Amino acid sequence: MMHNKSKAIQDLYPDELAHCYGCGKNNLDGYQLKTYLVGDETIAHFLPDEKFTALPGSVYGGLVASLLDCHGTGSAAAFVCVQENINLNEVETIPVRCVTASLKVDFKAPTPMGVELKLRGKLQSIEGRKIWVDMTLSADDTICATGEILAIKIKD
């Protein structure tokens, strides 16, 4: 059973595993992306800074890919916690951290600047240490990119 809402997954990573540029709580120069488990999906929000401009008014595609990457590994960790009956609201750290094995990104529409971006993740499947997550990145209800990640749970 999925939890209604959770603490931010990245805030539950142990300090020694929380330095990622995109989502690490210990990387003050990074994006500080926060992924939340809400029902049976994950959600994150991000407002891109002007320094991430590609063409005028549009977000650089590398940022889109890196947001999907970090949201995907956070989502994978959340879904493993659910499978292992770890209540994210009852722990200070989680024993689960995932890394990217494969990331596929399809760009569907230009991603606008000046708009909060919403990322969503849905569990596709878990097989052993492999976790597949489907994702979307949208702006104002327009899907700008879709992604699929194969994340690997780091060995204990």
Predicted regions and their residues:
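Hydrophobic residues in beta-strands and at strand termini
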Residues: 46-48, 107, 153
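A conserved, well-ordered hydrophobic junction motif at loop->secondary-structure transitions
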Residues: 43-79
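Short acidic/polar alpha-helix capping motifs at helix-coil junctions
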Residues: 14-18, 69-70, 84-85, 96-99
